[in-house]
């Protein structure tokens, strides 16, 4: 399986269609409703053999209710717009998501800014996290920006990694 090969399974929403037009699915949910959605998603993933303890909300934004509900449902890592939080130790590794599409801009000036920001972060030894909507990769500008981000991060010593939770190294193993 892909998981045994090192890939991470990350829960990225459950019923986004109900809220997509307004905001990210978990951006404004109270704890009770977030709890219901997380329980439902967890059961579905368990049924198909993809149960995970890692969570990244659509739009990278989570409500306080969602943050409260995640550990109650066994989740151990939250990846949001500004960092990765170990929900067991409550420690956060700060690292901003740099993205194109799906809530992020796609204009040429944004692509240039994204590349410069990623290079600055990598040069300073930070964690470079990228997100791109697949449909944006059909366009040459966003595609080249993402390739440049990866090349520059590697050039400055960043190592590719997946989101992973480990009690010995909270959250910082993801990049």
Predicted stretch roles:
Residues 17-46, 85-124, 142:
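Alpha-helical scaffold elements lining the catalytic groove of polysaccharide deacetylases
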Residues 3, 46, 71, 122, ...:
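Anion (oxyanion) recognition and catalysis
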Residues 4, 77, 127, 132-175:
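C-terminal domain-boundary segment and adjacent tail
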Residues 9-12, 54, 77, 94-96, ...:
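Glycan-processing catalytic domains of CAZymes
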Residues 10, 71-86:
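Acidic, His- and aromatic-enriched active-site or binding-groove loops in soluble protein domains
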Residues 1-68, 127-134:
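Metal-dependent polysaccharide deacetylase catalytic core of the NodB/CE4 family, i.e.
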Residues 63-78, 147:
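Short, electropositive alpha-helical surface patch
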Residues 17-20, 62-66, 86-87, 137-140, ...:
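Short catalytic/ligand-binding loop motif for oxyanion handling, primarily in non-cytosolic enzymes
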């Amino acid at each position: 399986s892909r998981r045994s090969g090192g890939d991470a399974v990350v829960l990225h929403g459950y019923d986004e269609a109900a809220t997509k037009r307004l905001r990210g699915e978990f951006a404004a949910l109270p704890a009770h409703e977030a709890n219901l959605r997380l329980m439902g998603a967890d059961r579905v993933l368990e049924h198909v053999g993809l149960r995970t303890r890692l969570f990244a909300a659509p739009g990278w934004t989570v409500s306080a209710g969602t943050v409260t509900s995640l550990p109650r449902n066994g989740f151990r890592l939250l990846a949001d717009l500004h960092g990765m939080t170990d929900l067991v130790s409550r420690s956060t590794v700060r690292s901003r998501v740099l993205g194109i599409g799906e809530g992020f801009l796609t204009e040429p000036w944004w692509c240039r800014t994204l590349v410069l920001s990623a290079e600055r972060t990598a040069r300073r030894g930070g964690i470079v996290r990228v997100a791109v909507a697949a449909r944006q990769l059909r366009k040459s500008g966003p595609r080249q920006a993402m390739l440049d981000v990866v090349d520059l991060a590697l050039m400055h010593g960043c190592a590719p990694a997946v989101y992973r939770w480990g009690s010995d190294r909270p959250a910082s193993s993801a990049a």
